[in-house]
Amino acid sequence: MKMKFYKKYLLLIVAVLFIYSCDSSSTSSYSVDNGDDNMGGGSNNTELPTGFSKFISEYTDVYVSGNYVVVESTGVPNHSSPYWGAGHPNYATPHSGMSVNPNVISAQNFKFYIPLNPSISGSVSSTPLGPIGVSISGVPFFNQYAGPNNQPLDNEIPSFDYYYGHPQQTGQYHYHWEPRYLTTNDSSMLIGYSLDGFPIYGPTEQSNDQYPSNLDELNGHSHSTDEYQEGTYHYHATSTSPYLLGGFRGKYGSLNGGGYYTN
């Protein structure tokens, strides 16, 4: 009698443990935040869009938070430059004709909030001075102007290093142009994202390695890409102004959680 009782008791314990273990199992398999950044609600069971897998993990941290993809980076380039300063392991001597500005690369604390589901806005928004997007290496993109009142970039271009970047006064290294280090071997690759959530590609098309002939005034157009098989609006780097993007085609996010604009 005692043996039968113990067997029934043991079977009951095993059954309870099995039910509990099934009930508490986790299904999450990707980097998702709980939305504590106060940048909007939304499902936390959202997978990163395919294009964001191209970000270089050594230099960026990419995850979903509410309605945003968040890209964290220090903004330092993954290549050599005279702007590292003499004595730095990544220091490079200035190339011929370069006019080095007095600034030195300094690590930043960037947190780009990029709309998870970008959409075309009813009107175009002007890009501000400062970061307007981020490259897959974590270096920010700046617009086509050198300063307030739409100062042309012409006088700053000689200060670009070999890979077309330079730092501003606080050491923020950035690209106004195509990031040459990324596109040297593939001029059609995805090079980053605008703050409005739309991808930015190199100067040529992935389908034929030709320069696009139908870009709009913002350097963008729509069709399928390797990362967006069903098609998407996207920008292309060009050798003439606006170089990367001439404005935000979509509703844009922010840098370091400064708000979400729905113009």
What are these regions (language model features)?
Residues 103-105, 158-171, 218-231:
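Short, low-complexity cationic-aromatic patches
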Residues 25-154:
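Solvent-exposed N-terminal domain segments of exported/luminal and surface proteins
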Residues 18-21:
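C-terminal motif of bacterial Sec signal peptides marking the signal peptidase cleavage site
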Residues 2-10:
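Bacterial N-terminal signal peptides that target proteins for export
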Residues 122, 141, 181-186, 200, ...:
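Short loop/beta submotifs within extracellular cysteine-rich repeat domains
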Residues 215-263:
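Long, compositionally biased interface segments
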Residues 110, 114, 135-140, 169-181, ...:
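Extracellular/lumenal glycan-associated surfaces
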Residues 153-163, 168-211:
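Short helix-loop boundary/capping segments
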